[in-house]
C-alpha cells in the first residue's frame, strides 16, 4: 500500500473529550469503513524527565513541567510522521508516556505499528497551535508568568518552538478538529 496515511489533528482544552472522541472515531472508521486507524496523544512524546530537567537548567525552570510546546520530543514526532508516510513502511515503535511516574515508559511498553495505517489521529491540547506575533509577547498574561517568568524567557521559548518545530509538524496534518468548551468554568467542572 503506497497510499500515505491521512493525518487528523484533534485538539481542545483539558476535559473537552479529546481521548473519548478519538476513540469513538477510531471505532467508527475501523468497524464501518474497514480502515486501519492508529491514535496517539502528543503527550506520549514528552521529553524524558532527565531531558526536561536539563532543559529547565539550560533555558528556564518552568520547562521542567511537561505540557507546553518545547517539552515534547519534536524530532521524534517528525520522524514518526515521516516513517508513517514512507512507501517502504516498516514497523514503527512509538513512546508511551507514563504520567504516574512523569517519565517515558520502558521500550517494552511502547506502541508498535506493524501495518501502515490508513488514518492517524494525533491528539493533544496544543495540537495545531500557532505561534503568537512577537508584539503580543511583551507582557505576562497570568500570575504564574508574572511571578516565575518576569523576563518572558519561558514564554518566548515556547513561542519559538511553535514557530519552528511545531509549525513544521502541524503543517503535515491533513485536517484539524478542535473541541471547544462553551466556557472555562465547564472545563473545571468536567475535570472534577
Give the location of each predicted region:
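Glycine-rich, phosphate-binding/catalytic loops in enzymes
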Residues: 27-28, 56-58, 137-140
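Conserved nucleotide-sensing/catalytic segment adjacent to the nucleotide-binding pocket
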Residues: 38-41, 45-102
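Hydrophobic positions on the alpha1 helix immediately C-terminal to the Walker A/P-loop
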Residues: 20-21, 25
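Conserved NTP phosphate-binding and transfer environment spanning the P-loop NTPase/kinase superfamily
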Residues: 119, 125-192
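Extreme N-terminal, non-catalytic leader segments
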Residues: 1-9, 13
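Post-Walker A helix-loop "phosphate-sensing" segment adjacent to the P-loop in P-loop NTPases
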Residues: 27-38
Amino acid at each position: 500500500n503506497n497510499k500515505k496515511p491521512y493525518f487528523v489533528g484533534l485538539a481542545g482544552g483539558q476535559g473537552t473529550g479529546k481521548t473519548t472522541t478519538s476513540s469513538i472515531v477510531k471505532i467508527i472508521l475501523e468497524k464501518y469503513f474497514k480502515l486501519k486507524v492508529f491514535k496517539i496523544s502528543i503527550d506520549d512524546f514528552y521529553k524524558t524527565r532527565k531531558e526536561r530537567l536539563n532543559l529547565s537548567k539550560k533555558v528556564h525552570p518552568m520547562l521542567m513541567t511537561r505540557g507546553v510546546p518545547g517539552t515534547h520530543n519534536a524530532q521524534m514526532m517528525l520522524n514518526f510522521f515521516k516513517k508513517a508516510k514512507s512507501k517502504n513502511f516498516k514497523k514503527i515503535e512509538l513512546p508511551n508516556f507514563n504520567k504516574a511516574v512523569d517519565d517515558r515508559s520502558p521500550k517494552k511498553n511502547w506502541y508498535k505499528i506493524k501495518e501502515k495505517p490508513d488514518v492517524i489521529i494525533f491528539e493533544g491540547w496544543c495540537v495545531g497551535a500557532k505561534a503568537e506575533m512577537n508584539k503580543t509577547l511583551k507582557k505576562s498574561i497570568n500570575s504564574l508568568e508574572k511571578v516565575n517568568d518576569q523576563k518572558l524567557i519561558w514564554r518566548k521559548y515556547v513561542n519559538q518552538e511553535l514557530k519552528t518545530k511545531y509549525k513544521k509538524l502541524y503543517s503535515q496534518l491533513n485536517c484539524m478538529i478542535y473541541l471547544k468548551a462553551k466556557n472555562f468554568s465547564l472545563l473545571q467542572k468536567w475535570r472534577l
